[in-house]
Amino acid sequence: AIDGTSAISRLWGTPASYGTALQFAEYCRKYGKTHDMMAPFITNSRHNGLLFPEGYWAQHRPEHLTTEDYLAARWIAKPANLFDNDIPIMVSAAYLFTTPERAKDMQQKPVYILNHASSRATPRSLTPTLEEVEAETAKTGRKLYEGAGITAADLSFENMYDGFTLFHQFH
């Protein structure tokens, strides 16, 4: 038997958009922002996706997204519109982890992982509140930076992909 809210979320998985839409609505209210502020980020993300030849957008749907298209899209769970939600695609990835000593003779230069972290907080309800999300993302960020021995100023780019665009203001 599955107890508590897990009985809902673990059986079929939680509906993707509504929780983040609720959190984003609260974010907009708290900080005086609007859904429209996401348009430059969303259109730039699509543009960048089209620049990646191995990516889905470049291979299967090489179409630009305009600000007008984004702002006019139908609501899925207000304030999350069609373009704030991931599209259903099948994907897989494989990563090989080894030690620096074993990787030293490889043709391809290895990538070093400095740290990893995740958040395993249990929300008070089925959907975490904005305060819970902000606290957990801050905690995860601190773990990542401290474990890697770097700060945000040491980074030259940010590449947090998530097909659900409204997550990004929390990271």
Label every model-predicted segment.
Residues 27-32, 140-154:
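Phosphate/pyrophosphate-binding loops at sites that engage ATP/ADP/AMP, CoA/4′-phosphopantetheine
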Residues 125-130, 162-171:
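Short glycine/threonine-rich loop-to-helix capping motif typified by GTGT followed
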Residues 116-118, 156-165:
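A short beta-alpha structural unit
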Residues 1-31:
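Flexible glycine-/small-residue-enriched beta->alpha junction loops
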Residues 38-45, 155:
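Short, well-structured alpha-helical segments that form the helix of a local strand-helix-strand
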Residues 44-48, 161-164:
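A short structural micro-motif
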Residues 44, 51-91:
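Polyanion-binding loop/helix "lid" in catalytic or ligand-binding cores
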